[in-house]
Amino acid sequence: MAAATAAAATVAGEGMEPRALQYEQTLMYGRYTQELGAFAKEEAARIRLGGPEPWKGSPSARATPELLEYGQSRCARCRICSVRCHKFLVSRVGEDWIFLVLLGLLMALVSWAMDYAIAVCLQAQQWMSRGLNTNILLQYLAWVTYPVVLITFSAGFTQILAPQAVGSGIPEMKTILRGVVLKEYLTLKTFVAKVIGLTCALGSGMPLGKEGPFVHIASMCAALLSKFLSLFGGIYENESRNTEMLAAACAVGVGCCFAAPIGGVLFSIEVTSTFFAVRNYWRGFFAATFSAFIFRVLAVWNRDEETITALFKTRFRLDFPFDLQELPAFAVIGIASGFGGALFVYLNRKIVQVMRKQKTINRFLMKKRLLFPALVTLLISTLTFPPGFGQFMAGQLSQKETLVTLFDNRTWVRQGLVEDLGAPSTSQAWSPPRANVFLTLVIFILMKFWMSALATTIPVPCGAFMPVFVIGAAFGRLVGESMAAWFPDGIHTDSSTYRIVPGGYAVVGAAALAGAVTHTVSTAVIVFELTGQIAHILPVMIAVILANAVAQSLQPSLYDSIIRIKKLPYLPELGWGRHQQYRVRVEDIMVRDVPHVALSCTFRDLRLALHRTKGRMLALVESPESMILLGSIERSQVVALLGAQLSPARRRQHMQKLRKAQMSPPSDQESPPSSETSIRFQVNTEDSGFPGAHGQTHKPLKPALKRGPSNATSLQEGTTGNMESAGIALRSLFCGSPPLESTTSELEKSESCDKRKLKRVRISLASDSDLEGKMSPEEILEWEEQQLDEPVNFSDCKIDPAPFQLVERTSLHKTHTIFSLLGVDHAYVTSIGRLIGIVTLKELRKAIEGSVTAQGVKVRPPLASFRDSATSSSDTETTEVHALWGPRSRHGLPREGTPSDSDDKCQ
């Protein structure tokens, strides 16, 4: 009986609208294995059957300040003061401004504290290395042990507390902003795991980044802040406002990371949104600017800076920063960076795929989860050991010190009439005794390239923006030093001579490679804000645009690649310059076998429709012959209809009618035994997978004011009925009446898979009539067969009268735009009101990937080659379809909504 109830709760939860994905921790990235799957159904069933969350109080339970005045405790007085202050601030300032100020302040404090802790960790490693320079073996052990311990701690701490904190965070935020709910992704424990894990990972000195994880951290901070402010009431009780605040939080994450508010807003829009609501523009700029300001003020307060300056300030020439003849060199940097960015994304994805295909190694490393990050860290630390191979790749420099030296405007080569100002101490790392600048830069680029691609697969909180940024700066510096060597006297223009500035080439290379990996143009703006100079705006823009053009034609962005690795729901971008996307139409890609129910169907038809599809929506048509689309109905509504029709309450009513018909007239005058006088206790020991899963079988789906008394009574009686009869009914409904032994074994097997088994004793009250008048299983099955043949009354169901619809000749390009703009996951295809197919996110994704490229060969749908674009529906077909609209008036369903209503419902 417990298994039958658990199975019913699972099936009843299949139609719940929130979409959640099951997270599975793998060796590297982790992935979401259930595509809107069983985990969401179980969670929906638990929430529906178990009631509201324990931390959420009812709105009516919130006390007003007037009522709080009666309390004499100190807590009551503090609550009154806080409520009054909140009302004053809201009336004078506004809720959005308060939220954005708090968000910017908190993120600036977190960013500064993390930078301070990371700097202390890196200084400790350098101090240990210098203190043991007399013994090369001890120095090596200290150099490799320190990062291995930090990375291992970061991986273990994250795995234990919140595995969702692993990785960048931008791919998941892109999915969340599209409407998908990721379980435990914006919680407090994930925030703690992300902050501590990222601090340890970056403090180890591995080639990892901070920008991507900080987007996730800012989003978690915004979600937690929204929950806190919702305790005071106001607009943050509305969950739809959280999406707007998450969009602003993504901008804050980049802004407080690099003190680049403008570039942070633009970068967050490019990497997380396909279509951006302009109403959120000012929120992102305000919060990012305030956060960047506080972040730099804290640096001045800590005496790290004398005043508010750029993070990597440069001193390039302003009167003549570059010559026109240098533009081809900048263009070469952009094209080469495009190929390099595509190669980096490909290499990163291949590392993950190869490790997953090696089943034996993968199985072994999954059992020893900390072994893989420890081995990768040991390998990278060994290669960067300064007295060893690290001397040929500036291994003793941190990422910040590396960028400072690469952006230096002085040349490192000593040939001809070059500017000899004396290299700074950190620049000496690029000129080892047994190598020159060019060899060191080449080795640095090649080694850091594959090291960064490998290090970003470690299951710790980390990003890839900063390592790619450093590699691009090194490549630009290599081109700049080469130009300075080829033109030692500079490029002659008229009577003036201007020497080459290699630091400018490094800035161009950093922006180009970072833009190629992320498929963004806003990296140019980030570079300008990082360096504090805009002198090289034209070379930077040329290189970034060329790099994006090359990279987008070869590989997806790094974040889209991770989305595919983690198997998150996504909608790929349409390739530009492809004419196939305009010739492919919806009728070529739609699924013609649409799960639907007719208005005049029986309950048997409903059960058959549930067995045929696992989707959360069913189309409601006028009749199987006309196929006129009347609306859509959720799967949960259909399950509720079937459950109410075959409920124990209806079966008891049927038994009472039979008993009254069999009784003689004198016996009819006798009063039936009162339920108050003959009550017995039934004690059932049950195994429940959900807390409170047996408290009630079905939660009414309509508000209490809209339900009739008979419906409410039947549902309430159904919850306290005999569980054995309910189990037989549910098995007959969802399992097609299988043998009792096989059903029992399957239910026991499903129970064994449940991780949260709770032993609970259920005490219910049952009358004598219920105990004495039981029906046999054969009688129950016969009665259920009769009930399944009755017609369905949809008047008590919630029906969407205006589901999103497309016509069969809608192009693939327009369909992609509609799905991206509205965030819908399915659309019905109609022809003059007649349902002919359905298009889901899965079919659209396959069509886009097939029409753009498939293994290097363009693929077109089969019907696209035989279509005549000039043809249209015949007059006979049009007349026949219009004739079907007449009988619709006899049905009492809500009329179809306007297209604007449909758009609003799909958002």
Curated annotation (Swiss-Prot):
The record marks E211 as: Protopore gate. Keywords: CBS domain, Cell membrane, Cell projection, Chloride, Chloride channel, Ion channel, Ion transport, Membrane, Phosphoprotein, Postsynaptic cell membrane, Repeat, Synapse, Transmembrane, Transmembrane helix, Transport, Voltage-gated channel. Residues 1-93, 555-907 are cytoplasmic. Residues 664-678 have a biased composition (Low complexity). The modification Phosphothreonine is found at T26. A motif (Selectivity filter part_1) lies at residues 167-171. Residues 650-660, 696-705 have a biased composition (Basic residues). SUPFAM superfamilies: CBS-domain pair, Clc chloride channel. Ubiquitously expressed. Expressed in neurons and glial cells (at protein level). Coiled coil: none annotated. Residues 590-648, 799-859 form the CBS domain. Common gate kinetics are down-regulated by intracellular ATP. Inhibited by AK-42, a derivative of meclofenamate. Inhibited by Cd(2+). Inhibited by Zn(2+) and PKC activation. Inhibited at acidic pH. CCLN2:HEPACAM channel conductance is up-regulated upon hypo-osmolarity. It comes from the Eukaryota. InterPro entries: CBS_dom_sf, Cl-channel-2, Cl-channel_core, Cl_channel_volt-gated, ClC. One of its GO terms (biological process) is regulation of resting membrane potential. Residues 42-55 are annotated as: Modulates channel gating by both voltage and cell volume. Phosphorylated. Activated by dephosphorylation. PANTHER family: CHLORIDE CHANNEL PROTEIN 2 (PTHR45720:SF6). This is Chloride channel protein 2. The gene is Clcn2.
